[in-house]
């Protein structure tokens, strides 16, 4: 019998571990079995410094791990309506926007920014300090290296990833028109410049 507790208008499994002193959370979230939110950052020298901020209506499936930030940004941020499958790892200082899907066993290094509507396939690995563009799709078992550029609106696949084609189905599903995609591409370029300084 799976037992969930209602805490702060969220459903939290009784086996989940949440560092409530360092975690701010909205409403309508589902936090599954053995999820850990607020563990120390996976960094050999930097200590935790700051908080985790979680929005509304996110689903964290079993064994997800979300780590505290360092003094780099002092925030690990998760927006709204995201879906994280089992055993995903979100390391320190990450920023995940809205409507993002992380499939099972996805691993995000530190200080990664995932833009709206991106989908990462099973066992995708992302190098630290990367940006994943809006409405992009990363195929199963993909590897995003330091040199990868994941533009909005495209499908990428491989180890390391290569651009395959435009994500037409994903764009249609999310009702993204050309004007909206142009705006997201401009935002991606701005974030990319800031991240790569």
Label every model-predicted segment:
Residues 91:
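Short metal-binding segments enriched for Cys and/or His
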Residues 13-17, 32:
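Conserved CoA-thioester-binding segment of acyl-CoA-metabolizing enzymes
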Residues 1-8, 30-54, 62-65, 69, ...:
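Glycine-rich hexapeptide-repeat left-handed beta-helix
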